[in-house]
Amino acid sequence: MKVTRAQAEANRERIVDVAGKLFREKGFDGIGLNELMQAAGLTRGGFYGHFESKDELAGLACERALMANQHYWEELSAKPPAEALRALVGFYLSDLHCQHTAKGCAMAALAGDVARAGPALKGTFETGVDNFLRVLEPLMQGGEPAERREQALAALSQLVGALVLSRAVRSPELSGELRAAAGASVLRSAAAG
């Protein structure tokens, strides 16, 4: 049975969505094409009808995951700056976010894989980082734009770093301490301006 153009596009979108979750959960090298396509409800043979390579899919999945995360941050940042930053930090460093890698922050889940990737994927990732910084900068209390930029860079580094470390340790107590300390530091720094 011939697949319609609309169905082919829907299949492609499903593959990208599933890949975004599986790549965040298992890394780019932690999932093979068979498992990925099976999770999307399709056969491996159809993969190359949609993508030239797994790298192409990784770029698209990374971009989509970063955009979804960014949209959520933008929703949270619609509040007054101090309230928005508290909401963003609270969500980002929550137990729920820490435990759900597949639906969580693409920066924290994929940074290690992207560091070993080629320039195209690094460019996609960098665009995502820049977009997150644009959300954070207005939430900082610094006077000059350069100061707010520096605060946003430090805040993003602390948030992502704390999430990465808290997912990597065995102890739930240490995981919580890492996230609590980073959150307190980000909020203190932003308020000090």
Model-identified regions with their sequence ranges:
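N-terminal intrinsically disordered/low-complexity leader segments
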Residues: 1-10, 193
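Short amphipathic alpha-helix in the helical subdomain of ABC transporter nucleotide-binding domains
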Residues: 8, 81, 85, 148-155
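Helix-turn-helix
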Residues: 14, 18-56, 60
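Hydrophobic alpha-helical connector segments
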Residues: 60, 74-104, 142
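Amphipathic alpha-helical packing segments from all-alpha helical-bundle domains
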Residues: 67-70, 74-76, 86, 103, ...
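A general structural signal for well-ordered alpha-helical segments in protein cores
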Residues: 85, 104-108, 152, 162
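Helix-loop "lid/cap" segments that line or gate small-molecule binding pockets
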Residues: 93-97, 107-116
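Hydrophobic/aromatic-rich alpha-helical bundle segments in the mid-to-C-terminal region
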Residues: 118-127, 140-193
